[in-house]
């Protein structure tokens, strides 16, 4: 027997059991009369096997109840069973939907606005392209790599919605075949764009990455996701998504090169979860690519963190001074109150 909040599915076997009890017939004797194994009869009574038309004819002979009665009962049971399973899935999905940032995503136009939980479930199933939301619990994007801060269990659904939107938007981007060597050869060009304005480097980045088989997409930040970016393979291209909430240049470029580090080091080609070592490796790639380790060490040894010296060093290595300032502040070489006029706030359009 299967039951949900509104439906109870009772197998024909329950009626067979009642008939046997009223006639004082054991399952063993009944199996012999039906010319079936005791195991099959047990499964039949408990609704674990289908009551076929052939079985219905045997029941008509043994119990004297018309075959059409049993066929109708079986048909009704299977219908009720399917309905109950759907209702149970809906109940489970309603719980999941209530934990997702649905209203925020509706305001962004990702899903249709509604207050009805059943409609939210329907819309979310279409958004995630799944028969039911429970599938999401066992289905992860293979080799997904993302940079998040303050991550918690409650952020998982927001991250899932953000990554799915990145995947959907990336399908609209025309890319060449994935070419990691091409990407490696383009790193210096990408780095040089740190001194450009967003309206210039956004277009250039998308073009450079498309030639490497990477679809670059910019998305709004979702509250609770704590995401700066995410990278994963979808079909025949790599999806690289970055948040576009107001952020400083140093955070933007570090996040971008962090994701590029995951791609170049092959972290997203595996079905295994991204581990701490992968994150450290991607961090090191971002740090060393933006500010070469040896040059940074020499700069630190001079122990002059004045505004002019930071600008001079930035000019020498060819990056925006705000990137150097951000790293000095993060590593506690200078207070966060120093030289913030060197920081540039990006407001990218998604």
What are these regions, as identified by a protein language model?
Residues 2-350:
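Active-site hotspot residues in diverse enzymes, especially metal/ion-binding acidic/histidine motifs
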């Amino acid at each position: 027997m299967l039951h949900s909040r509104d439906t109870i599915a009772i197998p024909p076997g329950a009626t067979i059991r009642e008939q046997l009890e009223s006639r004082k017939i054991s399952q063993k004797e009944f199996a012999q009369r039906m010319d079936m194994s005791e195991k099959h009869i047990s499964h039949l009574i408990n609704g674990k096997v289908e009551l076929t038309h052939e079985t219905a004819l045997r029941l008509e002979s043994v119990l004297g109840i018309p075959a059409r009665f049993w066929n109708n009962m079986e048909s009704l049971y299977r219908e009720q069973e399917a309905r109950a399973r759907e209702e149970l899935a809906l109940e489970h999905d309603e719980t999941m939907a209530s934990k997702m940032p649905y209203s925020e995503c509706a305001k962004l136009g990702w899903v249709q606005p509604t207050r009805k939980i059943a409609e939210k479930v329907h819309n979310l199933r279409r958004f995630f392209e799944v028969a039911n939301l429970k599938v999401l619990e066992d289905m992860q994007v293979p080799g997904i790599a993302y940079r998040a801060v303050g991550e918690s269990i409650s952020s998982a659904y927001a991250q899932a919605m953000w990554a799915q939107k990145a995947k959907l938007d990336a399908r609209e981007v025309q890319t060449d075949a994935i070419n990691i060597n091409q990407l490696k050869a383009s790193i210096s060009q990408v780095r040089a764009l740190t001194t450009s304005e967003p309206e210039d480097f956004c277009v250039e980045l998308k073009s450079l990455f498309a030639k490497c088989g990477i679809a670059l997409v910019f998305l709004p930040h979702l509250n609770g996701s704590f995401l700066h970016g995410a990278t994963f393979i979808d079909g025949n291209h790599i999806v690289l998504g970055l948040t576009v909430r107001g952020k400083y240049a140093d955070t933007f470029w570090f996040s971008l090169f962090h994701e590029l580090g995951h791609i170049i080091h092959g972290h997203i080609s595996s079905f295994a979860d991204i581990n701490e070592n992968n994150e450290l490796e991607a961090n090191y790639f971002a740090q060393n690519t933006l500010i070469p380790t040896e040059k940074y060490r020499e700069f630190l040894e001079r122990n002059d963190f004045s505004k002019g010296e930071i600008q001079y060093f930035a000019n020498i290595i060819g990056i925006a001074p705000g990137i150097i300032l951000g790293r000095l502040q993060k590593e506690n070489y200078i207070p966060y109150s120093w030289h913030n006029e060197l920081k540039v706030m990006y407001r990218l359009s998604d």
